[in-house]
Amino acid sequence: NTKFVYAAKSERCHSEQFANFVQLREYKKSFLFETKSSKGKPIYHTNVVMSIADKFVVICSECFVNENEKKEVLDSLSKTHHIIEITLEQMEKNFCGNILQLKSNKNQPITVMSETAFEGFTEKQLSEISQYGKILAVKIPTIEKVGGGSSRCMMAEVFLPKI
């Protein structure tokens, strides 16, 4: 594990609390960056901007405000992960950054995403993602429309050892 942490500044993520979290959890390196939506406002949650899987990351670097922060984040991620860039439109309209890689009961990687995200990715992007395991697209339009989030907002990865 790299013990790196990435976060987008927003109403839900403040610099001081982020610094406390980094210290408490003993992260080796932290990246706090500013983002901007197509409406000019900060992106409300990091998991909308990016999804870090075991060997790949889906990220919308187009929404980064500061070029130096963008370069630092992409340089860091590219050392350990295959980077799959998404556009601002894919992030905002299709929830393409809001995906989650899990492991099956056979310890095989599965990338869970909504049908909206699946349909928003290009064939090339889906091909890249599928190199790292099966894709599972689920129909959750009500969650996306009413809740404003997608598949990653509904789950968390917990990789506990078997007892």
Residue ranges and their predicted role:
Residues 1-163:
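The feature marks the mature, well-folded catalytic cores of soluble enzymes
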